[in-house]
UniProtKB/Swiss-Prot annotation:
Claim: Membrane is one of the keywords in the record: no
Protein name, UniProt field: Clavaminate synthase 2
E.C. code: 1.14.11.21
GO biological process, one term: clavulanic acid biosynthetic process
Cofactor note: Binds 1 Fe(2+) ion per subunit.
Any one GO molecular function term: iron ion binding
Binding-site list for 2-oxoglutarate: 294
The keyword Oxidoreductase belongs to this UniProt entry's keyword annotation: yes
UniProt similarity note: Belongs to the clavaminate synthase family.
Annotated Fe cation binding sites: 145, 147, 280
Pathway per the UniProt entry: Antibiotic biosynthesis; clavulanate biosynthesis; clavulanate from D-glyceraldehyde 3-phosphate and L-arginine: step 3/8; Antibiotic biosynthesis; clavulanate biosynthesis; clavulanate from D-glyceraldehyde 3-phosphate and L-arginine: step 5/8; Antibiotic biosynthesis; clavulanate biosynthesis; clavulanate from D-glyceraldehyde 3-phosphate and L-arginine: step 6/8
Alphabetized CDD domains for the sequence: CAS_like (cd00250)
Cofactor: Fe(2+)
Amino acid sequence: MASPIVDCTPYRDELLALASELPEVPRADLHGFLDEAKTLAARLPEGLAAALDTFNAVGSEDGYLLLRGLPVDDSELPETPTSTPAPLDRKRLVMEAMRALAGRRLGLHTGYQELRSGTVYHDVYPSPGAHYLSSETSETLLEFHTEMAYHILQPNYVMLACSRADHENRAETLVGSVRKALPLLDEKTRARLFDRKVPCCVDVAFRGGVDDPGAIANVKPLYGDANDPFLGYDRELLAPEDPADKEAVAHLSQALDDVTVGVKLVPGDVLIIDNFRTTHARTPFSPRWDGKDRWLHRVYIRTDRNGELSGGERAGDTISFSPRR
């Protein structure tokens, strides 16, 4: 089985040269910035381009691709943010450029209207008192979830670029792949979960200001090709009611636990998670609130799979919420 890690250290100079051709202030005209990134992505180093294209075409058993050894800002990196969204005039960071170039090789960077003020580029950093379902938690486990599994236009990929790791390098991004978990499920469980609509709650941002609207969406835990299915899973939000559904989801949950792998992100990493075939989580870490805490850059990528695109969309668009029914 091919390694999910791509060593990008040989490409650093080429990638820095490509990054320098991008507009200096991404958020001043994000559509234009990402259009230019698409053009430049055609000139990515051959080995990197091939790895991205293969992952986009067929995925992998692991369910993720880790680009390691990319160039970083190092001494020029500003302090870890403490608020969101980022200032519109913030200059391009190297890891933002890497995320743009790799992401445009895959598909369309997308914002979600109800999430992070509809912004496309997200800074991910610890925040005191963050909701336990939020990516801004730090000292509690961020539980396994397929990102926005309840959204009719859920992203195909979640990209996490690392500018700064946590101080003790404790935080792990955990990934559970359905391709690894499926062989652990018996035929009865597979049949129960396949194309079965299970009630699902939604994240706080999508609740329309209501504290607890209940399970307003329906998610199929397994769907697509029965022999190579897609995954819809959220440990906190999936809310099966039928006893047989509860049992089947519990078996799936255990299987995903059994195949989980951990990835410790370090500066210069871009982790690309196949959000149609995996669930992911993050282990706790301890922030110091010293301006040097863990700092990731997140973006969601849509492709033409599963009816995500109808035509005419652009990278940098923001879309509104429609729950799966």
